[in-house]
From Swiss-Prot:
Cellular component annotations (GO), alphabetically ordered: ribonucleoprotein complex; ribosome
Assembly description: Part of the 30S ribosomal subunit. Interacts with proteins S7 and S18. Binds to IF-3.
Family affiliation: Belongs to the universal ribosomal protein uS11 family.
Protein name: Small ribosomal subunit protein uS11
GO-annotated molecular function: rRNA binding; structural constituent of ribosome
Key words, A-Z: Ribonucleoprotein, Ribosomal protein, RNA-binding, rRNA-binding
Keyword Kinase on entry: no
Gene expressing this chain: rpsK
Role description: Located on the platform of the 30S subunit, it bridges several disparate RNA helices of the 16S rRNA. Forms part of the Shine-Dalgarno cleft in the 70S ribosome.
One annotated GO biological process: translation
Matching InterPro entries: Ribosomal_uS11, Ribosomal_uS11_bac-type, Ribosomal_uS11_CS, Ribosomal_uS11_sf
Keyword Glycoprotein among UniProt keywords: no
Amino acid sequence: MARKRGSSSRKQKKVGFDYGVVHIKSTFNNTIITLTDKDGNTLTWASGGTVGFEGTRKGTPYAAQLAADKVAREALRMGIKKVDILVKGPGPGREPAIRTLQGAGLEINQIKDVTPIPFNGCRPKKRRRV
């Protein structure tokens, strides 16, 4: 029988930051939101799957909203008040995640789009015909 894990003490030690970076990776299938310190060390994260959605519902704007709310609450609990936001990807969860972070009481310093764009790199997949 599997043993139930206790809560990690690692999160408790990280308290004391006042500034963080929120990375939002939004694809058509899911939205992953990660809170890091300025050096890039992960403090907490959430996604459409961790807030209780499965399958295609993970990619919805509502799932991104709930994931952003979870990250924002954890950030405020750690004492983080100011954040930079780095957004990557074309998914539908980009805007709701940013709005939720702003509405949760985090002060947003800057919002950057860091979606990777190839300078004519690999040949893309053939176009889908329906």
